[in-house]
């Protein structure tokens, strides 16, 4: 009896193939099916289990036995096309339903050699996704301008205008009346050219200063704008307020996509050797029951035939 599980385990290693994948959303129903290659043998039993150690069901024809708290309300079983295909449907998917599902066929030859048992195994990976793949895009697309002011009375806005060149994809426009400066941003420093004196200065860490909010429009994540004149400095800082964005766009119902590698806590820890041995024992019990039934039927029918023969004589 101990040789049968070892034989079935070796056969399962031979038939091992890369697992195909199917992807569904939370709340949907997922139908997983597999078909056997050996169509000449008779299927004694089929089984479904989930890695690593969770047996879902054992099925012999229309009789289905569930394990590990699985029920037909959660997982329904079907075996159409004369046991050529076995199918399960997982209803109302949750994140815990994701993982690798394995189906197995236990087959015997149609000849009198009932000791030979063939075994085929196939695996399918189920991925459960959420509905919030675009959440990060929504958060990154918004920006909230935040401004403060320093020494506005020292700024001379007469007869000058400002033109800004920024290395970010979208330009920043500052509508300060009648002054002209050119500011070029690099990665960590800001170069400012003074229109009145022609001198160039570099600010390593600019102070967060701003003009009036209604006088300019900023559409960027983080940017600094510095205008240097003869009498003062004005700097505009535009940042993205993460707290406000999460208040606006964050939804408790939307969660980043989740892919579960496939682990399920079960009441008992099963190994491949254990359930293969269970399958073998069950197969022998079924075959023994069939043999007992045939012997009983033969004995019961033998006596009436003998009685009829004696009456004829």
Curated annotation (Swiss-Prot):
<keyword id="KW-0946">Virion</keyword>
<dbReference type="GO" id="GO:0055036">
    <property type="term" value="C:virion membrane"/>
</dbReference>
<dbReference type="GO" id="GO:0019031">
    <property type="term" value="C:viral envelope"/>
</dbReference>
<feature type="glycosylation site" description="N-linked (GlcNAc...) asparagine; by host">
    <location>
        <position position="159"/>
    </location>
</feature>
<feature type="signal peptide">
    <location>
        <begin position="1"/>
        <end position="16"/>
    </location>
</feature>
<comment type="subunit">
    <text>Heterodimerizes with OPG040. The heterodimer OPG185-OPG040 interacts with components of the entry fusion complex OPG143 and OPG094. Heterodimer with C3/VPC protein; disulfide-linked.</text>
</comment>
<keyword id="KW-0348">Hemagglutinin</keyword>
<dbReference type="InterPro" id="IPR013106">
    <property type="entry name" value="Ig_V-set"/>
</dbReference>
<feature type="topological domain" description="Virion surface">
    <location>
        <begin position="17"/>
        <end position="274"/>
    </location>
</feature>
<keyword id="KW-1043">Host membrane</keyword>
<dbReference type="InterPro" id="IPR007110">
    <property type="entry name" value="Ig-like_dom"/>
</dbReference>
<dbReference type="Pfam" id="PF07686">
    <property type="entry name" value="V-set"/>
</dbReference>
<comment type="similarity">
    <text>Belongs to the orthopoxvirus OPG185 family.</text>
</comment>
<feature type="glycosylation site" description="N-linked (GlcNAc...) asparagine; by host">
    <location>
        <position position="194"/>
    </location>
</feature>
<feature type="glycosylation site" description="N-linked (GlcNAc...) asparagine; by host">
    <location>
        <position position="37"/>
    </location>
</feature>
<dbReference type="InterPro" id="IPR003599">
    <property type="entry name" value="Ig_sub"/>
</dbReference>
<keyword id="KW-0244">Early protein</keyword>
<feature type="topological domain" description="Intravirion">
    <location>
        <begin position="296"/>
        <end position="313"/>
    </location>
</feature>
<feature type="glycosylation site" description="N-linked (GlcNAc...) asparagine; by host">
    <location>
        <position position="252"/>
    </location>
</feature>
<feature type="transmembrane region" description="Helical">
    <location>
        <begin position="275"/>
        <end position="295"/>
    </location>
</feature>
<feature type="glycosylation site" description="N-linked (GlcNAc...) asparagine; by host">
    <location>
        <position position="112"/>
    </location>
</feature>
<keyword id="KW-0325">Glycoprotein</keyword>
<protein>
    <recommendedName>
        <fullName>Protein OPG185</fullName>
    </recommendedName>
</protein>
<dbReference type="GO" id="GO:0033644">
    <property type="term" value="C:host cell membrane"/>
</dbReference>
<keyword id="KW-0472">Membrane</keyword>
<dbReference type="InterPro" id="IPR036179">
    <property type="entry name" value="Ig-like_dom_sf"/>
</dbReference>
<keyword id="KW-0393">Immunoglobulin domain</keyword>
<keyword id="KW-0261">Viral envelope protein</keyword>
<dbReference type="InterPro" id="IPR013783">
    <property type="entry name" value="Ig-like_fold"/>
</dbReference>
<keyword id="KW-1133">Transmembrane helix</keyword>
<keyword id="KW-0426">Late protein</keyword>
<feature type="glycosylation site" description="N-linked (GlcNAc...) asparagine; by host">
    <location>
        <position position="69"/>
    </location>
</feature>
<keyword id="KW-0732">Signal</keyword>
<comment type="function">
    <text>Prevents cell to cell fusion by interacting with and directing the viral OPG040 protein on the host plasma membrane. The OPG185-OPG040 complex associates with components of the entry fusion complex (EFC) presumably to avoid superinfection and syncytium formation. Via its interaction with C3/VCP protein, protects the infected cell and probably also the extracellular enveloped virus from complement attack.</text>
</comment>
<keyword id="KW-0812">Transmembrane</keyword>
<dbReference type="GO" id="GO:0016020">
    <property type="term" value="C:membrane"/>
</dbReference>
<keyword id="KW-1015">Disulfide bond</keyword>
